[in-house]
Amino acid sequence: TCTVLGADSAAPEFLSLKEDIGVVLDEAYFPESLNALQVGGVMAKTYRRWDGKQYQNYLTRFGLPEKKPFKDFSRGMKMKLAIAVALSHSPKLLVLDEATSGLDPIVRDEVLEIFNEFTREEDHSILISSHIVSDLEKLCDTIAFLHKGRLLLCEEKDALREEYALWHG
């Protein structure tokens, strides 16, 4: 088992944690026929703390069309919609799985800035899986290396930089 936000994954209360977790995968999965406004409507029924105004602010900030079907979104637009959804229910933890892979550099920088804004709140954290070292450098305080499901190393980013000279900041 594991512990997430203080709850054991085997405990019954673990299921209630969905309210505190936002997830962005390497692909955005929404029904293709829905538009951004309809996705927001579905999420409002899914999350008790859904903030429609915040969601609308993200749609505007990202320049996402409200009535265009999801199937017609570009990859960058799909990722931005997934991020808007993940952030619009006041999560404490963001789980990001290759959330910036395949994005053009301008969109990636914009997305990373939003994730940085999220972590400025004291009770907010990000768990990120990425092969893009520059993204890890921009977002992470602590880095863990996994290989075949085993934890090989877990240290603060600055200590890794000093001890192993893995990258230069």
Model-identified regions with their sequence ranges:
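Helical segment within the ABC ATPase nucleotide-binding domain
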Residues: 108-122
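ABC ATPase "signature
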Residues: 154-155
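Conserved H-loop
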Residues: 123-132
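ABC ATPase NBD Q-loop/coupling interface
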Residues: 1-16
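ABC-family P-loop ATPase nucleotide-binding domains
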Residues: 19, 25-81
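Catalytic Walker B motif of ABC-type/P-loop ATPase nucleotide-binding domains
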Residues: 94-98, 103
